[in-house]
């Protein structure tokens, strides 16, 4: 609901500053991909690097974690003390791969949702039991449209002109086109 581009650019950090006033410890998890992880981390205030961890919820999960590790290191933080929560379309194979890659480098955790409780892909003809996505997001606030960019362009939401504005304002970096599993 920001009036100017500058207010818009600072809005995610203002929300997180408010969150920090209310919550401690394990509830201080950064979700950076709303307007693009690369731009979010590039403009993030230093105090945010002291939070408990980060949730990687779109784009390539390994690339997202590597970006977070590099960001923490630039801010003098020890990545091995940080929590990385991977949570986008995970299955057993992805969890095992990410766990191996980041073992000893970060505290890895996995938000395993739909594919934990509905991994019946291919059991019936025509994928009759295929999982579906049930995600609720606000589409407007105070009569103005909302926008979500994500690190995956397939997850973008909002009017095209506003998406273009947000990409410009937040300096959206590289987006990884990944098929949406659910």
Predicted regions located by residue number:
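Gly/Ser/Thr/Ala-enriched C-terminal appendages of enzymes
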Residues: 37, 50, 59-82, 87-182
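Buried, small/hydrophobic-residue-enriched core segments of structured protein domains
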Residues: 1-64, 97, 102, 140-144
């Amino acid at each position: 609901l920001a009036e100017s581009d500058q207010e818009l650019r600072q809005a995610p950090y203002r929300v997180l500053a408010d969150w920090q006033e209310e919550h401690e410890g394990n509830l201080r998890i950064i979700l950076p991909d709303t307007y693009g992880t690369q731009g979010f981390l590039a403009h993030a205030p230093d105090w945010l690097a002291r939070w408990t961890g980060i949730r990687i919820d779109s784009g390539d999960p390994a690339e997202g974690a590597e970006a977070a590790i590099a960001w923490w290191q630039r801010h003098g933080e020890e990545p091995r003390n940080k929590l990385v929560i991977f949570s986008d379309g995970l299955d057993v194979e992805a969890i095992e791969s990410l766990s191996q890659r980041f073992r000893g480098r970060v505290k890895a955790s996995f938000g395993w949702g739909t594919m934990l409780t509905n991994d019946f892909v291919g059991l019936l003809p025509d994928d009759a039991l295929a999982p579906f996505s049930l995600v609720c997001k606000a589409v407007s606030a105070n009569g103005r449209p909302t926008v979500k960019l994500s690190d995956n362009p397939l997850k973008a939401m909002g009017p095209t002109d506003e998406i273009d504005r947000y990409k410009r304002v937040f300096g959206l970096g590289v987006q990884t086109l990944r098929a949406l599993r659910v």
